[in-house]
Amino acid sequence: MGIKGLKPLLRSYGVHEYTVPLSQMSGKTIAVDGTFLLHKYKNCHSVPWHYLTLYTLSNLRLRNVKVLFIFDGMSPPEKSREKSNRRCRKQALMEKGTLVKAQLEVWKKDGGEQAPELAAVSERLVKTRGLDPSLTDPETVQVLTDYVDNMSRDTRVTSDDYELMRRSLDAFGFPYADAPDEAELCCVRVVQMGIADAPMTIDSDALACGALHGVDVVYTDLHGETLTAMSTSKSKEALGLNGEQFMDLCVMCGTDFNQRVHKLGPVTALKLIKAHGSIENIPSAAPSMSCLEAVRTREILSGGDMESRRKDYEAMVQKPVSAELIRSVFPPEFLDKLLHENWQLRDAMKRMAPEAFEKCKRK
């Protein structure tokens, strides 16, 4: 998702993601890639995605963080190949999960040697989670069962999911809009226009766009009360590039909208850009750059012209929390769970929307 191999390259130059408390953005506005957030929560295996939404929105209100949620609009045709590849990978994972789940049931019933696909999953869990290699411990078997169940689970985002997400935002008074194209690029441009203070998206396309437009920090994740951030200014400084050169490096790495040059990785791409200044200046004796579609890919990664929509985005203001909508959108068990998990959220939500929680169980 995003620029291929960019973050490992940056890490090799000492540029790492770092964390900041969410409270640091109190009173400020974040332009959030709502599509990224929804996909992230749908792929969470341990907690229902709609509860994660409730928790996050409550936390944002508690910390007095203003948010503009922006969802993907019409993707450019150049992204069709990447979208098709993602669908195929998702379908293949679900099919493998279904197969391994059936093999697990046979193994739990009959014992003996595991089928090859199940054995590969078991071996991976033994290495990554420190499970008992004998796989005889009940807790170990349960971990394996849960993992296999998640492999076969359909985590594709539906139109109903988007509708529920938007209703959830309405309940908490957060404004939202559809981007003219890619949400992550729109988030950066909204910041560049001075309408928001920082963008948030996991998609590294935003780093290319931010580096070009002078947006110094891109938040790449939100986990509880902590934001993860990446500095575009430090990234450019560490690599010795300006914004236009950083953009060309990203184009050469390969993106969701183009293919990189065969057998030309990020390290070589950086050397070529530093030596010649731009893709167009790379000598013809070097590998052909035609597959990069550099002009069009730069145009996409730069983000669309947002000035025509300035008034629409400036009119996106935060509204009060609606207790009535919260009760209609979130099931009672989610509201009860929220109140009893975090005393700060409990006190804050009872102040902002006491009627929404009046029927929750008391402890």
Swiss-Prot record:
Homology family: Belongs to the XPG/RAD2 endonuclease family.
InterPro entries in the record: 5-3_exonuclease_C_sf, HhH2, PIN-like_dom_sf, XPG-I_dom, XPG/Rad2, XPG_DNA_repair_N
Function: Probable endonuclease.
GO CC term (a single one): host cell nucleus
The keyword Magnesium belongs to this UniProt entry's keyword annotation: yes
Name of the protein in its database record: Putative RAD2-like endonuclease 095R
Record bears the keyword Metal-binding: yes
Cofactors named for this entry: Mg(2+)
Cofactor comment text: Binds 2 magnesium ions per subunit.
One matching Pfam family: XPG_N
An annotated Gene Ontology molecular function: DNA binding
Gene3D superfamilies (UniProt xref): 5' to 3' exonuclease, C-terminal subdomain, 5'-nuclease
EC number of this enzyme: 3.1.-.-
Subcellular location: Host nucleus
UniProt main location, coarse: host cell
Taxonomic lineage: Viruses, Varidnaviria, Bamfordvirae, Nucleocytoviricota, Megaviricetes
